[in-house]
Every structure is written in structure tokens, then in C-alpha cells.
Amino acid sequence: MNKVYSLKYCPVTGGLIAVSELARRVIKKTCRRLTHILLAGIPAICLCYSQISQAGIVRSDIAYQIYRDFAENKGLFVPGANDIPVYDKDGKLVGRLGKAPMADFSSVSSNGVATLVSPQYIVSVKHNGGYRSVSFGNGKNTYSLVDRNNHPSIDFHAPRLNKLVTEVIPSAVTSEGTKANAYKYTERYTAFYRVGSGTQYTKDKDGNLVKVAGGYAFKTGGTTGVPLISDATIVSNPGQTYNPVNGPLPDYGAPGDSGSPLFAYDKQQKKWVIVAVLRAYAGINGATNWWNVIPTDYLNQVMQDDFDAPVDFVSGLGPLNWTYDKTSGTGTLSQGSKNWTMHGQKDNDLNAGKNLVFSGQNGAIILKDSVTQGAGYLEFKDSYTVSAESGKTWTGAGIITDKGTNVTWKVNGVAGDNLHKLGEGTLTINGTGVNPGGLKTGDGIVVLNQQADTAGNIQAFSSVNLASGRPTVVLGDARQVNPDNISWGYRGGKLDLNGNAVTFTRLQAADYGAVITNNAQQKSQLLLDLKAQDTNVSEPTIGNISPFGGTGTPGNLYSMILNSQTRFYILKSASYGNTLWGNSLNDPAQWEFVGMNKNKAVQTVKDRILAGRAKQPVIFHGQLTGNMDVAIPQVPGGRKVIFDGSVNLPEGTLSQDSGTLIFQGHPVIHASISGSAPVSLNQKDWENRQFTMKTLSLKDADFHLSRNASLNSDIKSDNSHITLGSDRAFVDKNDGTGNYVIPEEGTSVPDTVNDRSQYEGNITLNHNSALDIGSRFTGGIDAYDSAVSITSPDVLLTAPGAFAGSSLTVHDGGHLTALNGLFSDGHIQAGKNGKITLSGTPVKDTANQYAPAVYLTDGYDLTGDNAALEITRGAHASGDIHASAASTVTIGSDTPAELASAETAASAFAGSLLEGYNAAFNGAITGGRADVSMHNALWTLGGDSAIHSLTVRNSRISSEGDRTFRTLTVNKLDATGSDFVLRTDLKNADKINVTEKATGSDNSLNVSFMNNPAQGQALNIPLVTAPAGTSAEMFKAGTRVTGFSRVTPTLHVDTSGGNTKWILDGFKAEADKAAAAKADSFMNAGYKNFMTEVNNLNKRMGDLRDTNGDAGAWARIMSGAGSADGGYSDNYTHVQVGFDKKHELDGVDLFTGVTMTYTDSSADSHAFSGKTKSVGGGLYASALFESGAYIDLIGKYIHHDNDYTGNFASLGTKHYNTHSWYAGAETGYRYHLTEDTFIEPQAELVYGAVSGKTFRWKDGDMDLSMKNRDFSPLVGRTGVELGKTFSGKDWSVTARAGTSWQFDLLNNGETVLRDASGEKRIKGEKDSRMLFNVGMNAQIKDNMRFGLEFEKSAFGKYNVDNAVNANFRYMF
């Protein structure tokens, strides 16, 4: 470029100036004359000549990659990024780009010489006369200049393009134009950045230059200082590359940068604006650049000149009829009597086409002729429908639909032409049949709703391209466009499947901006059957073979002339030897001869490229989102599928059938330097990617979650291999270029924790699946006939785990923390440096509370050095531990967590197993190599154990299970404040053997006997053996509650024989009153159920007296709560239904009836908790004498279904049935004080029978039993009631209140307790209480009544705290 001017050296300026090729002699003479002009006049004189600015001289102490990334918005320089640090090559901070958010340079053309300022216009300098086209973004679309629009007097032009640019957003243009000193105002313009592609140099602090590349090789960018001059021209000195006033990244324009932009950040408008284009510089060794400020008036006028008169549709006058004469390039839009002339392409002149703007609500246009509008576009300010007569088409620069508009487009295009669409509004494609034209959209919404022709053919477009990140294309149905012809260009856009099922055989996505989504309520089915490959192969370049050897690209084609014949070779290695002697051309490891026919050689290379592509992995850089399921069948040729974009399918399933699937992060793209790849496997900077779906379904697949990827999904695996935290990674060596994907496979291990992959969800493994966890994991695992291997130090099982026929191994620094219980029918293995932590479940929104959890396994194998097993914070673990290597076992914690009350049955069960300790283990520890520590913990020996060392603090070690005795062998024992519980059958016992050293104090030695010792029996059984010299005070006899007794062993210490032994002599046993009281309270629950029924026995007969003896069907519901000593409380709901009949006799009314009852009660105390459900029935009779006397009789049977859990003596949960009988009689006399007021003395006697019950179980190895026999309560009651009746014309209410004394005449049942120390009998007691009641009965209708009563008792051992009785009666 820059062909209009040549460069000449001017000694006055110390640099080059641009002169016309037609004026060389004049300029030479002028330069000579400049030597006589004062230095102060130099700037003005230099500006008289159009010096060519020729481009990028930058600091040598900053990595050149920084300047490249800056220019292309890559690396750190993402648009909008703030406070970007700039470091030199030694890692020292040079400065920060903190005065403005990072600018978006996408509006700068790919060659850096022009900038897009409107969808169809660019700006540059007019002396750039050589370029005829521009491209943007990744340069895949080329736009032709149809009019250069050169400024008449200054070095500036604003060319018009043939099409609307869809890839990028135009740059905003300064609103201040050439206003004097405007850009020196730093309060408004806070930063100045430039980008260009001129000749590249680096400069050191001594001013030495090193050339990097020639002009237009690539773009660089950087900072410039505040302008020294600001008017129609901006002048500054970015060539002073180490001067801080130019910012941390100064970039001095040099040869090739003419027309490149200068951007300024407008703080007032909060956006970057282009203010000028680069015109000149002061020479390679100079410092000054000159920019021409954008002449905004001229620019606006240029764009305005390309518009025809606006068209205003008037509703009610019919459609706009559009006729067009291709020969003249003119047409007419007419509506009624009004006409608008338009201009289209004239011959080959695209610029003859003018833009049309349409307004008017709900407009309609009909094309009568095909319209070729050239570079003219259509802009719709309002919603329109555009249709065409049969076969008529439209072509032009494109369509703009303004925000809020919906344009229905019923016009087909032309093959080979693309409809370019911009604007935030909607364009609905609604033509008929097959549209051979394509679509390129860069903004707004395009709805594809093409209609079928008479043959049923539909095609909205032959191809669709989305770019710039702004557009959305919505599929009306699955036939609108061949999915394989949909592509996403620079920054992409959204393809909305709109509830349709769509199949892709290839994905053409340039970058992360490519989005496939579904926003419809109907779920879409997306099939990625990625078997197709790109068959477009560029013509390979042919390199020359150096006779002296050299380097090249393996697989590329080279040629050499030998004996006057051109021979073609394919290079096999990265370098090759000389071809003169030791001819390397004959070495098959270096070269492959492919003949002397150029065309055949070229085709051979192409065929091999295609063959290679058939095996290449598929990399999708884009995004899958919305309401859809995605299926990926096996890809032919074993090709792998890699996602380095993202997936967000919260309610969707992604399924992979066979083959390899990889989710990974994305390497940060950097600008290429001299052909370098934009990304590499060994780079340090990667972008995180998120993958979210409801379910990831894998069948016969190999799945990898690699670096910088986060997966949030459940996984269902069938015969598949899952690697979480894989080091496997792929990069696309064409990433960010928009070219065909060139994958490179390798390994990439993250350097920081934040770059590691992470998984959250629940995994189900089936049918020989394998799971390798090498990264952060949170969730659950269920494995069936599968294998799990953990090497990650950060694996958290938050859901209950199940392993059936499956292995679980933690090794190589892996750490598994389980928080919610686990089941395994096999052994869990910890290898070298592997750690397993079993914990309770953290309680949400608390700092240190944990709910207990149970871990049931067949065992734990500690097979590698430094393996560790930790049982802590409310965990109960069972399963033998075998330590075959030096390892550690920790039970409990010296800083124990607070155990929360159980909210689930599983948690309650786990809590009961802890027995008040912070953690518990049940099993043996073998191997002799484990170091075991216990803090506030319980270890129940499940078998003989051998360990290296044992440290015990405030803990308990006991032996339980079958009647086999256990031996604990430990080399070194350190125990303090702990409890050791051993068993004996009076002949043998559990034993503790310490072989090397025993230390500690305040330890209790307790003995649980399995047989009842004879009075005064001497035992002489060794319990603990320790090395000689061990303190005799280390163990003392402890007292332990076992069953219902407090048992204290009698011991003596024997120091003879070279050991210290603690020997059991016998026992002292006495009843434990607390345990006995709990047992008695449990057994007396039946008495309290009996009293509940007694208090509700005669309610119906009392109602008869209040209702003047009306008989009939009735129903009653009662609810109450009671309490007693020992923390006892109960509550019940009691329902009665019945029917009675009245018999009128001489002087007496006799009522007989039948009743059925149901009671649901629950009870809780310090000793037990549970529920009783009772069902019963009975007969009753009531005699009401005319004198006021009455007699009530009732008989009743009740069956009780009981379910209770005792928390004493290891009772556990018991389910049992009982029954009871009742026979009651009550008599009294109702004396009327007035006609409606009465007093009623009463006396009642209830006799009953309550069935007994017997329980037998074991507390440890001690046999226990509890029994109470059938007993017959006799309960009396005397009292008085006072009542009054209130009545009206159609109603009456009887209110009453009463008090009575209820008392037991017989003791309740005796409880018999038995354990190894003997039998204990607890005699039944009597109870009594004062009852209070208040109630009312109301007549609702003649034959309906409603009653309500409240009761309470006091002064008893068992009292009714409150009771409510509601009844309803229907008389007939």
C-alpha cells in the first residue's frame, strides 16, 4: 500500500516525508530550502507535507507478545478489562492500564489500515490508495470498497463498503471533531490507545532498534500520551518509548501504519471513541506522530449522500408497490398517488445503489420486479411485511431492523449472495419454497419460518452465519436450513432450536461466542452425529528445498530442480540435511518423493490432509444452553469429542455413546508472532469453563474432566471410564483465527489450585465402570460392580455412598472426606500418602455442629506408607482395619465438634451407637504397623488387634460381640483419663498386652462379666500385661453400669515375672437405681395408656344427662397431653363413635348403646420414646331416674400396638402388642337448685385388667430381661359438678364446671429386672390426682347437639396437663 506517495529523507525533520511521484524535484528543492528556516518553524513546515506514517516501534524490555495481544484484544487485553498490569521481561511492574477499561479494537480492519465507524463505512487516510477491500474479526469475510470518498483537502477518506459488516460493532466517533485543544482535556479524555500494522521494531533505552517484521505482517498496539497539539491534527511523541508520559506501552507509528486509528476514552460518555487516523511520523529515530482528526461533518455528509428519500407508509392506502428497471438502475415505490424514487446498481457500479429508510406502522411492500440495490441497504424504523410476486428477488447491502420492529420477509434471495442483517429488531423469514441465498446476521433476531412450496420443499437459506455475538437465529422448524450449513463467525451468536429436534454432522464454531440454545418450553433434542469433516482444503504452498539443509513443516510440500526437472517432495521431519553431499533427499526419514507432476503432488498433499482430518478430534469452542437434551453417538474413526466452551442444560441430559468425550477449560488465546500458534498445551494461562446439566449419561465411553473445567451434573455410567482431573488436554492451533480446527493432543497439568477441574454432583457407576478422581469433588458415589480410585486431595462425599461389588482406593496424596455415611461390601483401601476421613454431616448454617453418620464396610486396608484413616465428628465406622504399612488411624478429635440432635432415623441410629462420644469405631485393627490415636472416642474391639502405638485420651476401649475373647497387642501405649472395658466368663477374659512401653494415668479398668459369679468366688484372671516398671497407678478399678447394676471389679497388680500385670480377683455389684428407674418407667407406660382410656370412658353417659336423655348416633374427638417425673410427657388423640337407644320404663329412662374407639398416642421421657395405636369397642348402659339419680355402667376391650425405643441398657427399639379390659360404674344425683341450675355429686369405680410383657436382650455380652405380669388396676373417683342451662326460642346451652379426686385403690403392676448380678423387683405404686373440668353442650337444631369440654389435673405423679373434648350428636 502507500503507493501514491514515495518516501524522501528530509534533514530538517530528521525523518522521511511523503511526496508525490509526480513532484520529486519540487520536494527535493523544498527540502534544501528547509535548512534555512528557524527550528521553531519546523512543525508547521513538516505538516505542509504529507509524511507517511509507517508504524510499530515499541520497548524492547517488554515482551513483544504484550503489544501483539494488546492490538488483537487477546491475552489480558479483553475488552472491558480494568487495571491491567504491565510487566517487563524481568517480571517488574512497569505500570497499569488503569485510566480506562480496555478498548475493543474489533472495528479495526484485519490489516490495521482502516476502522469501521458505521456498518458500511470505514475511515483511513486517502494516501492509502492501494487497498481495495477490508476484513474484520478473524478475517473470514471480505468487504469491497465501492467508493473511496476521499476528502478534497486533507489526507482522509471514508470509503463505503459493498455490504453491511456483520462481524463487528462499528467504533463510536468523537463528537468533538476538530475542536481546538479538545483532546488535551484530560478530565474528559483519560487515555489514548493506538493500533497499527506497520513495520515492527523494538527499541532499547539507548535507542538501538531491532527490526521484527515488515509492514502489514501483523498488528501491534499500545499507549500514547496526551496530545501536544490538538485541533485538526493531533501531535504527540510516542517515539519517546521510555517516557512515562506515554504510558506503560508506548507504540510509535512507523512505515505501514498510515490510516491506523487513534482511540480516546471519553469519560463523559463512558466509551472509547476514534478521534483520528495516523498520517505521518518523524523518522525511525524520531519520536513524533501526526494524526488527522476525524472531520465529523464531512463523514456525516458522505454517509448522508448515500440515502434516497425516506419512504413513509400510510395505513389504509394499500401496499407499497416496488418496480425496478435493471437497465437504468432506478425504481419506484408507489402508494396511491405518492411515489418515491430509488436507485440501485447501475451496470457494475454497486455504489450507485442508495439506502432506503422505511417508516409507518404495519407497512407492506410488494416487489413487482427483482431489485438489485447494489451497495444500498434497507432500514426499517417500523414493522413491515415485504413480499414479492412470483420469482422476484432482492439483493443489496443488507437489511437493518430497528429496535422494537418485526419485519416479515417473504422474498427469496439469489444463489451466491448473502443477505446481511443488522439492527436490534426482528426479521422473520416467511418466503415460499427453496431460497438459494445465504444469511449473514450480526444483530437482532432472525426467525426462520419459510413455507413449503407445492412440492413440499422448504429452505429459508442455503447457509446461515452468525457473528459479532449479538444475533439470534430462531428455527421455525427443523427443515428451515441444513444444520451443517450453519456457522458461527467472529464472536458468534445464538441459534435457538425453538423446541425442534436438530441433527448436526459437523459444527463450525469459530470461538466461544457460538451458542446453540433452546428457549422454548418444548424440550429440543440435539443430535451431534459428528461424522462429517470439512472437505475444503486450501491450495498448499510449495516451499523451496535449500541445498544446504534447513527447517520446515512436516507434511508440507517442497520442490527442487534437479537436472532441469522440478521434483516434488513431502517433508517428513522438522529439519533436513544438505542435498549436495550425503543427499538427504534419499533419506525416507526426511523426505518422501511424490513425483514430478505438480498437480498430482498437490492432490497427494490434499488427500493426506483430508485423511488426517478424518481421524482428528472434534473441538467445539462454543456453548450449549437452554431446554434441551444432547446426544453424541460414536464418532467414526475413533475421533474424540472435546468441549472447551461450556454447557448449561439445568434440566437436560447430555449422553455419550462410545468414544471419548472431554470437558476442559480453554487456553487463553494470544496473538500469533511470525506464524506461532495462538495457544499451546504448556501455556500457563487458561480460561475456566462451566459445564452444567441435569445428567451426563455415558455408555461404553471414556470421559475426561480436564483442567480449568467445572462440571455440575449427576453422572450415570454404564461400562464407562470417568477421569475427573485428567491431565489430558487439546488445543486448537488455529484457535481464534476462524480457520479449520487443527487439534493438538497432549497433557497439561495446572500450576494452581484455581486451575484444577472440579466436579459437583452424584455419580452412579454400573457394569464395570471406572472412576478416577484427581480433582476437586463434591457429591455422592454409588458403585455397582465398578472401581473408584482417588488421587485428589479434595474429595468430599456429601451424599450417602454405596459400593456393591466395587473397589474404592485412595492413594498418591488423595484425601477422601465422607460426610453422610457410606456402605461397602468390600474393603476400602488407602495407599501411599492416601487419607480417608469419615465424619458426621455438617449442620447447615452452624459453625461446628455435625449430625451423626454411620459407615458400614467390610474393612479398611492401609497398604501404603503414610496412609491414614480418620474417624471424627460424629462418625461411627465399622469394619476391620488392616495396616500392612506404616500408617495412622485417628478416632475422635482433641477439638471435638458439637453433635446436633438427629433429624433422620439414620442419624438417630448413628447417634445411639456413639454412646456419648464424639466418634466411634467397631472392629479390629491388625497388621501391627498402625499408629492409633483416640480423643473422646469409642473403640469396640471386633477381634484380636495388633498395632504399633496407641494414644488414648478421654476415650473408651471395649470388647463386644460373640463370646470369643479379644486380645489387644500394642507396642507402645499412652493412655490418660480413659476407660478400658473387658469381658470375662469367670475363666477367661479379654486381654491387653503392651510389649514395649506403657505410660499414662487416671485410667479405669472395667470388667463386664457374662456369667453370674458365685458369692466370694476368686478368679485370678490376668487382664493387662505391660513391661516391667510400668506404674501400678496407670489403671484403677472402675465402676460401670451394665444392665441394671453397677459393677466394680476387684483387682491386684502383680509385678513378678518381669511384667506388670493387672489381675482380676472378683466383682462387687449393686443395683443401679437410675437404670432401674428407667426400666420401671418404660414398663409402666401401659398404666398411663390405661388412665388415658379411663378418663374418657364415661363421657357419653354424661352427655345424656345434659341433653335430657336424647338418644341417637354420636361422635367425639378428644386431644390431650400429660406429664410425669423423669422427663415423661405424652399426648394423644382419641376418637369415639357410637349409637344408643332410649328405653322408657316406670320412673326411669334406660339407655343402652355400643361404642368404638381409636387412640393415637405418643410418649417421650429420659428413658424412652415411642408411639401406641389403640383400637377398642364396648357396651354401655345409663339409667336416669326421675328423682335426679343416675347409674352408668360400661364394659370395654382395647388392643394396643406399641413401638418404643429405650435408651438404657442397650435396649433399642421394641415392637410389641398388649391389651386391656375395662369395667366401670358411676352413680350420682343431679339436684336442681333452680329450674335451670343444678349441682351433681358423683362417685365412680373402674376395674380393669392390663396384660403383662417380657423383654430379653443383651447389654454387651450380659443377658438381660424385663418383665411385668398382668395386673388389675382399681381406680376410684368422687367429685361434684355445677351446671346451668341457658335457653332461647330455638336454642339451649348447658354450661358446667366440676372437680373430683381420682385415686388408685390397688397398686399397679410389679416390674422384675434381671441381669448377671441377679434379680431386682420394683413394686407397683398407687397414684392419685385432682381433676378439674369445664364444658358446655349446645343444641344446634332439634336433633343436633355440639359439646366442648376442657380438662386438667394436678397433684398426681401423672397428670393431665390439658385435654380438649369435642363431640357431635345426632338424635333420632
Curated annotation (Swiss-Prot):
Q: Where is the active site?
A: H127 (charge relay system), D155 (charge relay system), S258 (charge relay system)
Q: Which domain of life is it from?
A: Bacteria
Domain named Peptidase S6 is located at 56-301
Its GO CC terms are: cell outer membrane; cell surface; extracellular region; periplasmic space
Transcription regulation as a keyword of this entry, yes or no, is no
Q: What kind of modification does the protein receive after translation?
A: Cleaved to release the mature protein from the outer membrane.
Gene3D superfamilies cross-referenced by the UniProt entry:
2.160.20.20, 2.40.10.120, Autotransporter beta-domain
Q: Where is this site: Cleavage?
A: N1095, N1096
* Listed transmembrane segments: none
GO biological process: one example: proteolysis
Q: Which keywords annotate this record?
A: Cell outer membrane, Hydrolase, Membrane, Periplasm, Protease, Secreted, Serine protease, Signal, Transmembrane, Transmembrane beta strand, Virulence, Zymogen
The UniProt entry, under SUPFAM superfamilies, shows: Autotransporter, Pectin lyase-like
Which EC numbers characterise this protein's activity in its record? 3.4.21.-
Q: Which residues form the Autotransporter domain?
A: 1106-1372
Q: Which principal EC class is assigned to this enzyme?
A: hydrolase
Q: Which GO terms describe its molecular function?
A: serine-type endopeptidase activity
- PROSITE patterns noted in UniProt: AUTOTRANSPORTER, PEPTIDASE_S6
Instruction: Provide the leader sequence positions.
Output: 1-55
What's noted about domains in the record?
A: The signal peptide, cleaved at the inner membrane, guides the autotransporter protein to the periplasmic space. Then, insertion of the C-terminal translocator domain in the outer membrane forms a hydrophilic pore for the translocation of the passenger domain to the bacterial cell surface, with subsequent cleavage.
Its annotated function is as follows:
Involved in intestinal colonization, displays in vitro mucinolytic activity, serum resistance, and hemagglutination. Important to penetrate the intestinal mucus layer.
Q: Which PANTHER family did the record assign? A: AUTOTRANSPORTER, IMMUNOGLOBULIN A1 PROTEASE AUTOTRANSPORTER
- Additional note from the record: The S.flexneri genes encoding ShET1 enterotoxin subunits set1A and set1B are contained within the pic gene, on the complementary non-coding strand.
Query: What protein is this chain from?
Result: Serine protease pic autotransporter
Which source organism? Shigella flexneri
